[in-house]
Amino acid sequence: GRSGAVDCPELQRATTLTEASVAACGERLGPQAPLYSTTLAADDLAALLDALALGRVDLYGDSYGTFFAQVFAVRHPEHLRSLVLDGAYPLGGGEYAWYPAYAPAMRDKFNLACQRSPSCSRLPGSSMSHIEPALQSLRAHPFAAQADDVSGTPHKFTADASQLATVMFGSAPALASVREVDAAARAFVAGDQLPLLRLMAETQVGVDSRDEDQAPLKFSAGLAAAVMCQDAPQIYDMSLPPAQRRIARDQAIERREAQAHGTYAPFTIGEYRRMPLDYAFIDECVGWPSPPAAWPAGRLKTGTVSYPNTPTLIVSGDLDNMTPVADGAAAAANFPNGRQLVISNGLHVNALPRSRSDCGAILVRRFIETLAVGDTACAQAVPPVRLVPRFARHVDELDPAVALAGNAADAARLRAVSAAVLTVGDAASRATEISKGDGVGLRGGTFSVTETPTGYRLTLRELRWTEDLAVTGTVERPFRAGPAKAVLSLRGAAAADGTLEVQWSEGMPAAVASVRGMLGGQAVVARLAAP
């Protein structure tokens, strides 16, 4: 009852993490810094369970929680009935300090999403080949940029290869980044920079784990740094004084450049290192004070750990590059009674309410109840992410919706239908990212989000995904699966004024939207890919 949140002002209220500010936090914590370790936290949990006489428990951990849960399992296996690791990575071993699975999983994320998308898979090459020209342009010609995030807050930054790396590795916003990077990169090379710059601005917000008032009680940046520097494997020896550690760091990177320069391909090691410290990892702790001999960093040596026979389920999403499938497999292999479950089209963490499907939650609950997962067919039935086919500044650049029986609208009006539906999709993909409930359109207008008993409602006000079409109306969507509906009023593009009703089903692969309405006095009856 006397514990409190770790508050390092130099991190908690910093605009950007630096090696110096992380080191200053360690100095502020002083002799107590090594005590904020996962090992001691796991021991505390065991003491609480003993005091409460709860017997064996079922322990669930996600993301960093999987690290904590594994530490608890190897130190206190007698307390466990079952273990679930959702979005898991191993305690260490081998080259893990370099995060070697990080970049391959990032490449797979975009390539798999493209292969599963009808519009993207029709293009020649892989998604990474679609993105490569934008990377080359940013690498050769970085520039000062400004763009608004989804809330309308402007951000100034240098648009360069490292900013693109942050978008692609950071997965924040998770859905929008997978959905848009391929098309945004193609648009960037074609002269429309805004979609990619918007993603860069949004990612600056998304990779910041602090809440808006930067309260350490909600997220402690100091604790995150202390745990990283005390527990995680590093490319240098944390027992060295910081000055010697920097020399060791530089030597290790020089060797890596010579022996495995493609570790973070398509980005160089230097471009990777210029991402935020807590996403690139390898430089974050170089200045952290040396721990005392009594409390050495990384005390849980992976080579000497004995993993228990506890029934263990590892859940991984095959579009998750933060805790890749390969890392989940490595964690599963350590447990004699471990099993990995891969959720197709799953992102980072798949059993919590905001995941793309309820499959992970269903299987985890079944595992906890019965110690078996049973039928796992749902893991292969999660629908692919619906990628943006292309970005367009003007309606006439888009493919028209497909006319159905009873349609009287011409191709121009059917292109306006496509633009309107893509406008809905653009806002909907950001609905869960808006903390205050209000957002702005790519090229103008606003929208708001309110939760309903079964999902959420978007209210669009003159929302512009293209420059020449404003969309106003409401969108009703379920959280995951079920019927969705949009009632829209269009204004702008030639002869596109009018109203549309759009209906589709969420939670289905290859979902199709049906559209009815009147545009410019012509009846619309059409279909196209769901937003």
Q: Predicted segments — roles?
A:
Residues 115-228, 232-233:
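Alpha/beta-hydrolase-fold enzymes
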